[in-house]
């Protein structure tokens, strides 16, 4: 056999793997979604994850053997992407699985056969590892396969023993490595040496069950779980130095390089890293969006947003200044569509999401990078090596600049970020935004923790009762335990049982009264601390003492309004999923007495028609009078029935399910109406974005709708009187005014451009001549960026062969720069994007663009003359 493996494309490798196992009785299954069935798992991170319920005995398999090519995403080592040969966020895992059928001997034999016979890997280049106690696997490799003992390495449990958790199925594994340098011999083989070895096939033998004591018992039905990294085996067969230069990824890299006007192979290492990051991350985001993940600030949505932002920033690092991600995404889609047709089918959605996120982040990046550059310069000037947590938090809180991006840029400048200080600033802000009750909560919790061993948890009876006879267990004033308190005192009270709902799940706490013999306490809020319901209120009359028997009574009217609004949020989520997008998920909510608020993950706002349809659907459900079915169910059963759970929420083994059959089913501990008809009517007040990828709907229900409409009527009447038109004529009148304003603005912009061009024409007389080139470097007063760009293009057209660099200060503390180079100047090694980006740094800014035309900005207008002087000097030096 030849000393080198045969050359195959990535698609051919995938097909040959699946066909090999299909011919041996395996069912070929399509890749599962990157969104796992288990809501507690963020993303599909391994080929075996879709089969985990089978391995854990929770589901009976429909077949004994299966083979897949599974899409996976891992971001735990994201900082290593592009810097090592094999770290990626997106990868495909080829796998063959046996559920109680064949086991170790057959799995090893087939693993060796496909590696050596199908893929043609030379046997002398393969090394295998086994678990140090797995004598059976060792013997199979040595005696049946014929691997020499020098090339069988025993490894510890950390490397070669798979577990599903603290208890459950587990077993040893065996890995096959490819040796790039067999000439180094078999003495002292070190499989950790990634310059020589790459592990490409892992065979897991699930043969034990581990109990709570750590004891291993042989399983009656043993399973096989294997994984061959497609990118790794492709690197080996295509004989390239890393995974990125395989035909699975490199075409994406080439597209990015072409947009940037650079060549990958002749680029420096930092540029190659950026190109690799783009190549990898674009694969990830294309498949994530195709699997209906949308960018947001939580969960897998934030993973998507972070990856998109890293693509944009690394594009900037290689000189791409504008939007480019969809050009690169098109290459990724084309590479994937034969194996994963859904990426082409969802192309429009993918590109719309990427375009929106890229445009939004470019604005954030412009502001944040400029400010961070100033911070870094100041830190270095002071001889420090750490960016303060306060500065990092200001970037995050005020300008939306992500902490991890600050850390990444800091690392590039040999600095670190005080993350602990950042977290402290976050805590300070969160505490500063709380009301008086929340500020006291910390003291209350401390006091209750001390008393927890001596008093019982509060019994909540508010689902079925509005009044309770109770005993005062704990009395606090400003969080400090007291035996009694007099009229006029703000108090916190813990009762042994209560009908008051404590703030939870977005629903505010009940209001009402606690009364007794000569005592009246007005309760304004209720919060839950551990197992205790804390009633915040004011003693209106009498003296309250620990041990008093009292009557606790909620404000029934307020409760009715709150529970109507809470049920309305459930109907709202159901309507959004039905009408707008089944992938919509809750990102937060507020249920109060007078209104409701619902935050949800969505890449776009709702259209007027969609808002109307959502309203109509909810009001239809209200009119249909659907009765509630409320049950306590095991969590697994509730999920199996399709109950909606909020991602990231921790649930117990038993959950409360609010079910309006045929309409909505959610896990929820809040209070609700018994029939949708009790809501009365529902009206959406507003729909808007509150964060990138997060939308917010505010709405009212019941009598609050009438209050809202009365206010609207008054506003319409006032506008009608002001414009002296009928209410129905208002839209037309406003449109007319808007059109007139736009016309005026366009005329103004045209005049600005004409003025800039007129100013620039006078510069032709001042052009310097350097050999065959003409150079114009000048400052124009008060010219906006677009007009400045037009002036530079016009000047270059007139001088022909040469370079034009213009600067201006269009407004206070804002510098605008533009460079326009002829093709002959480009041939001298000068690129406008890189050139103007470097010049802009003098003004505390940055930028870039194409080799022939690029724009940049800055914040220090006083440095513009120096920047232009530097530009003049560098151009003369390069072209003279």
Curated annotation (Swiss-Prot):
Q: What are the binding positions for Zn(2+) in this chain?
A: 566, 570, 668, 672
A Pfam short name: tRNA-synt_2c
Its UniProt entry gives the catalysed reaction(s) as:
tRNA(Ala) + L-alanine + ATP = L-alanyl-tRNA(Ala) + AMP + diphosphate
Give the main localization category.
cytoplasm
The alphabetical list of record keywords is: Aminoacyl-tRNA synthetase, ATP-binding, Cytoplasm, Ligase, Metal-binding, Nucleotide-binding, Protein biosynthesis, RNA-binding, tRNA-binding, Zinc
Q: Which cofactor does it need?
A: Zn(2+)
Q: Which InterPro entries match?
A: aa-tRNA-synth_II/BPL/LPL, Ala-tRNA-lgiase_IIc, Ala-tRNA-ligase_IIc_anticod-bd, Ala-tRNA-synth_IIc_core, Ala-tRNA-synth_IIc_N, Ala-tRNA_ligase, Ala_tRNA_ligase_euk/bac, DHHA1_dom
In terms of HAMAP family, this protein maps to: Ala_tRNA_synth_B (MF_00036_B)
Comment, domains: Consists of three domains; the N-terminal catalytic domain, the editing domain and the C-terminal C-Ala domain. The editing domain removes incorrectly charged amino acids, while the C-Ala domain, along with tRNA(Ala), serves as a bridge to cooperatively bring together the editing and aminoacylation centers thus stimulating deacylation of misacylated tRNAs.
Family of this protein: Belongs to the class-II aminoacyl-tRNA synthetase family.
Q: What does this protein do?
A: Catalyzes the attachment of alanine to tRNA(Ala) in a two-step reaction: alanine is first activated by ATP to form Ala-AMP and then transferred to the acceptor end of tRNA(Ala). Also edits incorrectly charged Ser-tRNA(Ala) and Gly-tRNA(Ala) via its editing domain.
Question: Under which name does UniProt file this protein?
Answer: Alanine--tRNA ligase
Q: Which organism is it from?
A: Nostoc sp. (strain PCC 7120 / SAG 25.82 / UTEX 2576)
The encoding gene is alaS
